[in-house]
């Protein structure tokens, strides 16, 4: 498994049913909760502070999560982090989705059930409310999400949990 301690900082797997792709790299003070799934070529580095990844979260292919001293990272339950996302010392609320190729900087806080659209930049220290759509660089609130859109964000997370179980059972290297 691609898990590494650095000094006294080590990865902790809480609960069960984790999926960590063979080429992902997790280093340092990381807490990974039940049903969290970490996909191919993800790098999670926590040598400076703690990264907590909540139950049912998915970190999709090519994403990077890193923290600076004094800027821990927390992803609440059922957060979806899209492909090639860069998260740095931020907090993401329950059931939110961070779109492909987005960047969220130190001290930023994303509310619950919020959609950060693809290619969006959330600046350092920015606070985004619950249940909104954010687009652009810098990211701006465009509108509130409809209840069915927020439910769709949760379906993404639960779908990735199911997909991760399929991969755990069926993924085999070719020789």
For the regions a language model picked out, list residue spans one by one.
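Left-handed beta-helix
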Residues: 16, 21-22, 27-28, 33-34, ...
